[in-house]
């Protein structure tokens, strides 16, 4: 592959080593600062194809692969380079190219020539889909580190359970994050924060942020269905939940953000009609609609996918929660929580 006469298939081994070290450093910093995101990614990768792809390209699995490449670069560099070339040749082809471009009319005037130039630089290739399948194994891992706090994620899916998606699930996120989870995890439990979501795909998660607890947090997640069955809120609180949900759904976006949202909608098949239906369900949500979500939450929890990142002593003290425990950095798995 050449661009402006420059051969792009030549790999400088010294520069490649530098890039791998940079990637390892940035990935490690991301895991340290966003342990809640990493824990959710890992737990949902057990059962979700999309999350599995995200995990092997940006999550803990990705970091540990890069870490191994750096550690074994001298003996494995030929294999690494061959693999990178194989991936580049399979993905970066004319037939596989999709372009998302956001600009005003003047900006669009540059697009045809730029795309022609880029297209000519790419090999024609074969339009091929590469299936990525989640392992379907509930590993339930604990990743240990020197951290004093924990990130505890409980994930699952209600897809295939017969329950339809509803916009009220967005309102549930607001209600949980500012009521049940906030009171039990933040106020009573001492966690710095808590997050949750159940998405249109059926995947859902509950996760704590900088949490001193482990098993106690998972027990709180288990109590969500009962909380919903007895859910009550007056008109003022329901209005507050609706406003909070709509403000998140209809947040003003920059042109770049609009382009990214549009591309995501295009890939997922999300239409304006589907978004409006979701908006209407939020605006018309009643207490009874929130109570009716207890079944969906039970299905999510029934999946039983769990991942925790944090303090080694705490994770080992609650080892019965996990199917495997391993160091987050430079480690190999220890099965059955040993």
Regions found by a protein language model. Give the residues of each.
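Short amphipathic alpha-helices in soluble, non-transmembrane regions
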Residues: 1, 111-118, 220-224, 321-323
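M16 family metallopeptidases and their MPP-like homologs
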Residues: 1-75, 94-103, 151-171, 180-287, ...
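Charged, long alpha-helical assembly modules
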Residues: 79-95, 122, 320-322, 327-337
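Non-catalytic, conformational "gating/processing" segments within enzyme and secreted inhibitor domains
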Residues: 80-115, 302
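His/Glu-based metal-binding/catalytic segments typifying zinc-dependent metallopeptidases
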Residues: 96, 100, 105, 112-187, ...
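In a subset of proteins, long, contiguous C-terminal domains/tails are tracked
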Residues: 284-338
């Amino acid at each position: 592959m050449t661009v402006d006469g420059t051969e792009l298939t030549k790999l400088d081994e010294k520069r490649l080593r530098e890039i791998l070290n940079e990637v390892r450093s940035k990935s490690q910093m991301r895991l340290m600062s966003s342990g809640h995101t990493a824990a959710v990614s890992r737990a949902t990768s057990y059962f979700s194809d999309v999350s599995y792809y995200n995990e092997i390209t940006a999550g803990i699995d990705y970091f540990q692969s890069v870490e191994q490449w750096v550690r074994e670069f001298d003996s494995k560099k030929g294999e690494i380079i061959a693999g990178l070339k194989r991936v580049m040749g399979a993905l970066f082809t004319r037939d596989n190219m999709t372009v998302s471009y956001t600009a005003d009319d003047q900006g669009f005037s540059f697009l045809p020539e730029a795309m022609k130039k880029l297209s000519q630089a790419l090999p024609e290739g074969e339009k091929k889909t590469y299936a990525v399948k989640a392992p379907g194994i509930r590993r339930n891992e604990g990743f240990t580190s020197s951290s004093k706090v924990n990130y505890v994620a409980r994930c699952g899916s209600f897809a295939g359970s017969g329950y339809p998606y509803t916009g009220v699930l967005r309102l549930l996120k607001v209600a949980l994050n500012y009521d049940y989870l906030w009171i039990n995890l933040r106020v009573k439990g001492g966690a710095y924060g808590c997050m949750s979501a159940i998405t249109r795909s059926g995947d859902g998660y509950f996760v704590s942020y900088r949490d001193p607890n482990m098993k106690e947090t998972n027990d709180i997640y288990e109590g969500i269905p009962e909380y919903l069955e007895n859910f009550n809120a007056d008109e003022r609180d329901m209005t507050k939940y609706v406003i909070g949900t709509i403000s998140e759904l209809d947040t003003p976006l920059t042109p770049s953000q609009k382009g990214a949202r549009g591309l995501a909608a295009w890939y997922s098949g999300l239409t304006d009609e589907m978004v409006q239906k979701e908006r209407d369900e939020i605006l018309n949500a009643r207490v009874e609609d929130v109570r009716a979500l207890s079944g969906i939450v039970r299905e999510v929890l029934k999946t039983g996918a769990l991942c925790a990142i944090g303090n080694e002593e705490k994770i080992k003290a609650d080892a019965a929660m996990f199917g495997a425990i391993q160091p987050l950095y430079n480690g190999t798995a220890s099965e059955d929580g040993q």
